[in-house]
Amino acid sequence: MVNTSFETLALDMQIEILARLPLKYLMRCMCVSKKWASLIRGEDFRSAYLLRSMARPRLLFVASRSRKFTRETCFHSVYQEPPLLLSGKRQMLTDNHIAPVFTVSNPILGLLCHQGYNNEIVICNPGLKKFRNLPQIQVPEGASVRSFFGYDKVDKVFKVLCVCVPQTQFGAGWTSKEPKKYQVYTVRSDHEKPSFWRPIICNDDHSVVTDEGLFNGGFLYYGARSSCNKPMVMRFNVSSEAFAVIKLPEEVDIDYHWRLVNYKGKVALVNTFDSKFKFNGVFEIWVRNEVDRKWDKDIIKIPQWTESVDNYNVYFKGTTGTKELVFAPPNWFGEPLFVLYYDKATTNLRRFDIEGMDDQHYSFHTFLDHVDSTWLM
């Protein structure tokens, strides 16, 4: 191939130019030559592309629905910072690419982890419309699985943690002396050799009680119960693959109603079953103080709450880079889809309707800080 003016540029200049392109154009560039494909798949370019994408994070909506013969999942995203929700709209609709969605992880560096009701686990890059099915995890008969997704900053790989528990242990108050199984899968780049499920040891046997976990600062967090039914939060170091127990205040009797969220960069707990929040706009949030190793309770009262939510059920999803609190519904039944942004400093509550999705019944997940990345290219 004859050298073009682009190929005569310095490598860092080539990366700078390509990093400005949307993902769909990068896919086309990879077809130009093996050299371009190698450059775009490289670690230097991946880091440069992520850095630019993080400057404009996105709100990501993941919705699933059943039709007569198919199961569909819709990925819909918009920019989450000003001009808020009015630009950058992008949508992808899958048809049987992934199993019926049971849980969806928070996005990490552009990737999500889906777990189906049949325990099928799929890694997805919605920006690239790329999927990778992980090997079927082997579980004991009658057992169920909870999966959590994290990133190892040391080795620069993603990892999926799976906790296999006996069926009778699900839900708060259910305990058993039967041993659980803990396994990890390392998600590597396409050009690297495939991985496999590896058993790991946890010295603090526990059952998972929250449907979703939280990845924050190199650690995975999720709600759990000990073998003696004591509520706690488990912390998993994604790099060292070591578990640790975080004690909870006596007021927090954690079960599947609780959610772990990112609150201004800190790990926090909220109870989605709090009736005061649903009807009065008053909710309690427990924020983890790692310096003092304790949980601090914060009570937040939001003005004009009932006028803004119209009696819909909404969950607290976390905070944006501008420290605004974000709320969104857990389900969508064809009514206007919306999100709420609340600024504690100014007490300003804003509602934004989300357009571009049809009026079908969806189970619904809303995520903050989604970015474009070249993982799975």
From Swiss-Prot:
Pfam families: F-box, FBA_3
Every F-box domain range: 3-48
Alphabetized Gene3D superfamilies for the sequence: 1.20.1280.50
Superkingdom of origin: Eukaryota
Cross-referenced InterPro entries: F-box-assoc_dom_typ3 (IPR013187), F-box-assoc_interact_dom (IPR017451), F-box-like_dom_sf (IPR036047), F-box_dom (IPR001810)
Cross-referenced NCBIfam families: F_box_assoc_1
PANTHER family in the cross-refs: BNAA05G37150D PROTEIN-RELATED (PTHR31111), F-BOX ASSOCIATED DOMAIN-CONTAINING PROTEIN (PTHR31111:SF138)
Protein name per its UniProtKB record: Putative F-box protein At1g70380
Species: Arabidopsis thaliana
